[in-house]
């Protein structure tokens, strides 16, 4: 009875962990999709520079392909683990454990690789100044994608230019910065701010923002936290799966052992009862012979007297 209660408890815990797998995997996919616009625009602005290489090394190899593949696979694995737990299927549970172990090793290797790449990122602040060369094509019809990338980055990161908003006046033929540099954006806001109040423009350059982006954004920190949480949950799930496998395997062997023991006990009891039944006639005959011998001896002694 106690073993059955333990099995129920283990199954409930595995249900909860599989639910966590689904929730965390969906969260990772959502955050990765959220980061896609950031990464696409950053790569557009940093094309053919050392900054682009740093962005690719920091984000793309692990954050997008590997994490997305692992999370999609975890959703499927969680479903099979749930089915194995419901049906108490030893084969499904063993496959579930092995798959979790392989995924955990892949995640661990990716984490180590990412840490080494972050240490090796060769970007310095001086490299950010080279981004000014990408400003000269802003607003040209054939470079609409670059114009969109600059506007998106300046709006999202609340910055203007590379070092300062005057970079737009130095590197282009514009008389004032783009409207995306305005704190409160509306058509013609940049011209109005440039003529009346410069405080209505973002004062910080985008170079520092991009450098901070390479050091790690909130989205990247969230992904790292989710990755660590998934790893810890996988360890717990593997421990519980091994325990459940042992309990189910023991339960399947235990009834046979009990049956054999009961058969042996029944056989021994039957043999003992049968032996007693067989011994009863013999004992009665011995008692009769003993009585007859005693009576004969008594009769013989009386004749001698």
From Swiss-Prot:
InterPro entries: Tetraspanin/Peripherin (IPR018499), Tetraspanin_animals (IPR000301), Tetraspanin_CS (IPR018503), Tetraspanin_EC2_sf (IPR008952). Component of a complex, at least composed of TSPAN12, FZD4 and norrin (NDP). Interacts (when palmitoylated) with ADAM10. Interacts with MMP14/MT1-MMP. Residues 34-59, 111-224 are extracellular. SUPFAM superfamilies: Tetraspanin. A lipid is attached at residues 9, 12, 83 (S-palmitoyl cysteine). It is a multi-pass membrane protein. Gene3D superfamilies: Tetraspanin. Residues 1-12, 246-305 are cytoplasmic. Palmitoylated; required for interaction with ADAM10. The precise position of palmitoylated residues is unclear and occurs either on Cys-9, Cys-12 and/or Cys-83. Signal peptide: none annotated. It is found in: Cell membrane. PROSITE patterns: TM4_1 (PS00421). Belongs to the tetraspanin (TM4SF) family. This is Tetraspanin-12. Keywords: Angiogenesis, Cell membrane, Lipoprotein, Membrane, Palmitate, Transmembrane, Transmembrane helix. GO terms for biological process: angiogenesis; cell surface receptor signaling pathway; maintenance of blood-brain barrier; Norrin signaling pathway; regulation of angiogenesis; retina layer formation. Regulator of cell surface receptor signal transduction. Plays a central role in retinal vascularization by regulating norrin (NDP) signal transduction. Acts in concert with norrin (NDP) to promote FZD4 multimerization and subsequent activation of FZD4, leading to promote accumulation of beta-catenin (CTNNB1) and stimulate LEF/TCF-mediated transcriptional programs. The chain crosses the membrane at residues 13-33, 60-80, 90-110, 225-245. The gene is Tspan12. One of its GO terms (cellular component) is plasma membrane.
């Amino acid at each position: 009875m106690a073993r059955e209660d333990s099995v129920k408890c283990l199954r409930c815990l595995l249900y909860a962990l599989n639910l966590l797998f689904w929730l965390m995997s969906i969260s990772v996919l959502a955050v990765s999709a959220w980061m896609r616009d950031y990464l696409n625009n950053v790569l557009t602005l940093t094309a053919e520079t050392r900054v682009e290489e740093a962005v690719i090394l920091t984000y793309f190899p692990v954050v997008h392909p590997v994490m997305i593949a692992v999370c999609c696979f975890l959703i499927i694995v969680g479903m099979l683990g749930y089915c194995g737990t419901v049906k108490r299927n030893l084969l499904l549970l063993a496959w579930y454990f092995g798959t979790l172990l392989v995924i955990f090793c892949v995640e661990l290797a990716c984490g180590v690789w990412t840490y080494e790449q972050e240490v090796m990122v060769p970007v310095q602040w001086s490299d950010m100044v080279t981004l000014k060369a990408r400003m000269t094509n802003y607003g040209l019809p054939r470079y609409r994608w670059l114009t969109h990338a600059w506007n998106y980055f300046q709006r999202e990161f609340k910055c203007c230019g590379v070092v300062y908003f005057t970079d737009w006046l130095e590197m282009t033929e514009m008389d004032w910065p783009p409207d995306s540099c305005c704190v409160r954006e509306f058509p013609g806001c940049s011209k109005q701010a440039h003529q009346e109040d410069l405080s209505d423009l973002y004062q910080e350059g985008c170079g520092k923002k991009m450098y901070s982006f390479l050091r790690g954004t909130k989205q990247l920190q969230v992904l790292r936290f989710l990755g660590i949480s998934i790893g810890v949950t996988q360890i717990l799930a593997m421990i519980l799966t091994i325990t459940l496998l042992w309990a189910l395997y023991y339960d399947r062997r235990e009834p046979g052992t009990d049956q054999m023991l009961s058969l042996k006990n029944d056989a021994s009891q039957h043999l003992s009862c049968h032996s007693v039944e067989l011994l009863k006639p013999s004992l009665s005959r011995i008692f009769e012979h003993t009585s007859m011998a005693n009576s004969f001896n008594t009769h013989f002694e009386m004749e001698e007297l």
